[in-house]
Amino acid sequence: MRSKFDTQLRELGEKLTLMGAMCEEAIANSAKALLSGDSELAKKLAPLDLEIDQYERDIETLCLRLLLQQQPVARDLRQISAALKMITDLERIGDQASDIAEIIPHLKGRTGSECQAMRPMAEAAIGMVTDSIEAYNKRDLALAKSVIEHDDVVDDCFLSVKTALIDMIRTGHGDAEYALDLLMIAKYFERIGDHATNVAEWVEFSVTGIHKSNEI
């Protein structure tokens, strides 16, 4: 019985890793499309979002089956419970990468300095997603804490970009509609960072049994 349970736990980890990898791919491709003005690449991202959604459903089903059939306790229960929470954030990351991709055609291929200012934020967000999934797989508490701390980097990037874009709108030194589109994209990257932080916090819970909400 335990051998079967361990096999299913490994399957859970593998599926969650694949879902995380798809989220990384979605963010990376949306960032690439943004920074290169590649509308065609942006339009190709919708199927990946659907695949991420399907993985969320599959993992949720597996987690519920494990909870009902195996009645896990302690560490195993935390691992499964954390996975159920994490897939919600990963699915939203996929949605936000897709939302970014949907805006890109409206930018009409423009890749000026305002657009390029998104690069550090995009790279930081991708790195946070990658590290949060790795922390889950390795039960690496230090890496999870590093992701949580790194959220400030994304927030600082967002504030910098937002200030510049609002100033651009206020002074009339540019296309206001273009600036608003970029501001929305920046907000999506900032939210991706928040969701990656949530994932890392659930990793911390799976290892320690403690969550920052103190409601667990």
Where on the chain are the PLM-derived regions?
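Cytosolic, long alpha-helical scaffolding segments
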Residues: 1-216
